[in-house]
C-alpha cells in the first residue's frame, strides 16, 4: 500500500453492489488500476469518475486488490467529445484499446501522454477517424506486433508503390510482388500513410488530411491487421462499426431527399 498523487484518465466505471462503483483509471505514475468508490453515484467523486475525465488524483494504491481515491484536483472533461456520439464512440474505443494494450500496474508514461494528447486533439476538432488510426498503428507494439511500413522486406528499398504480405509480415516492392501470390493488393497510399502514422509527431497531426475513400481503405486494412496479429474483439469497436453503418445509411437517405 502506498500514498500517491498522479494524473489519471478515467477509462471506465461500472456499478458495484448497490450504490458503489468500480473505476478503472490509467494513471501516469502507477499504470492502470481498479479503484473502489463508495457511494460512487452520489458522493463528491461522482462527477470526476465519469469516463474520459482527467484529473490529478490523490490515491491509496494497492498492488493486490482494489485501490482508493482520497481526493482530486484540476479535473478536466472533454465537452466536445461527450456531446458528439461519433467522437464519444471513438474516444471510448481508444480508452478500451489502451486498457487492452498493457497489463494493470504497468507504468507507461509514454502511452499515457499519447492517449491524453489524442483526446485533446479530438476535442479540438481534428479528424477523430484518422487520430484513431494513428493511435491503433502506434499502439501495436504494446501487443508485441512490430511491422515495418517503410521498406521492402527483401531489398529494403523505400518510396515505392508497396503492397503488404502477411506471409512475410511486411512490405513488398514491385520487384518482389511475386514472392507472395496472396499479397494484399492494397492501394499503395495505404502503406504510405501507415508509414507516416508510425512516426508522426503531435504537431504533424494537425496537417493530416485524408479523403473519405482512403479512410475506408485504411479502416479495412487496420481491421485486418488487428484480426491477424492482435486478435482482440472490443465491444466499443463493434459499436463504432455499427455506428458507421447507420451513418452511411442516414447519409444516403439525406442525399435521396
Curated annotation (Swiss-Prot):
<keyword id="KW-0233">DNA recombination</keyword>
<dbReference type="InterPro" id="IPR022572">
    <property type="entry name" value="DNA_rep/recomb_RecO_N"/>
</dbReference>
<dbReference type="InterPro" id="IPR037278">
    <property type="entry name" value="ARFGAP/RecO"/>
</dbReference>
<comment type="function">
    <text>Involved in DNA repair and RecF pathway recombination.</text>
</comment>
<keyword id="KW-0227">DNA damage</keyword>
<dbReference type="Pfam" id="PF02565">
    <property type="entry name" value="RecO_C"/>
</dbReference>
<keyword id="KW-0234">DNA repair</keyword>
<dbReference type="InterPro" id="IPR012340">
    <property type="entry name" value="NA-bd_OB-fold"/>
</dbReference>
<dbReference type="GO" id="GO:0006302">
    <property type="term" value="P:double-strand break repair"/>
</dbReference>
<dbReference type="GO" id="GO:0043590">
    <property type="term" value="C:bacterial nucleoid"/>
</dbReference>
<protein>
    <recommendedName>
        <fullName>DNA repair protein RecO</fullName>
    </recommendedName>
</protein>
<dbReference type="GO" id="GO:0006310">
    <property type="term" value="P:DNA recombination"/>
</dbReference>
<dbReference type="InterPro" id="IPR003717">
    <property type="entry name" value="RecO"/>
</dbReference>
<comment type="similarity">
    <text>Belongs to the RecO family.</text>
</comment>
<dbReference type="InterPro" id="IPR042242">
    <property type="entry name" value="RecO_C"/>
</dbReference>
<dbReference type="Pfam" id="PF11967">
    <property type="entry name" value="RecO_N"/>
</dbReference>
